[in-house]
Amino acid sequence: DYNIPQIYWEIGHPAADYDNLIHWWAKHAASRPLFIGQDVMRTVNKADARNPLQNQMPAKMKLQRSLPTVQGSCQWYAAAVVDNAGNYRTMLEKEYHRYPALIPESPFMDDKAPGKVKKVKMVWTYEGPVLFWTAPKAKDEMDKAVQYVVYRFDKKEKVNLDDASHIVAITRDHFYPLPYNDGKT
């Protein structure tokens, strides 16, 4: 279904250079999604050869994002991210992954998207405004919608569903309580 090579070494490692390995995997991923396995501690404990005042996280992220076949990364081990070793989690949240990510498409498994939601309406409740919708119908279990993405755009703003900065929620529910500030939803 997908590839997650454990490229746990650092850029410049004499036996297993991260740069060489990621390029090899980017070329040989066999037309399947490619996510890079990152070793958090090696990344934050090794200096960037081009900028010794910082760790290797910026260089690795730049390299990953420069390769179109690399669709993301997985961090090992999770506790190092939770514990914010070397400000790793902070950098992910503030610099690299500020907005929610959607589950990548897998057209080789199923290329039929669920239908569009229907009967979208806002209802005032005792807790404030809530957006409701009806799930699209599907004949096959694989074609059912299981999550919904709620975006927010200003009235005069052009809708761009590729701009993740407008995602306010990803939910399995058929409703979303709208934020209500200063008389605006």
Write out the residue ranges for each language-model feature.
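Short, solvent-exposed loop/turn elements at domain surfaces
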Residues: 45, 83-84, 131, 141, ...
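Beta-strand-rich modules
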Residues: 154, 177-185
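Short beta-strand segments within Ig-like beta-sandwich modules, predominantly Fibronectin type-III
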Residues: 166-172
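Solvent-exposed loop/turn segments flanking beta-strands in beta-repeat/beta-sandwich domains
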Residues: 136-164
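A structural signal for short secondary-structure junctions
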Residues: 27-31, 66-69, 124-125, 142-144, ...
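Pro/Thr/Ser/Gly-rich low-complexity, intrinsically disordered linker/stalk tracts
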Residues: 87-144
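Substrate-binding cleft of secreted/luminal carbohydrate-active enzymes
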Residues: 1-14, 22-108
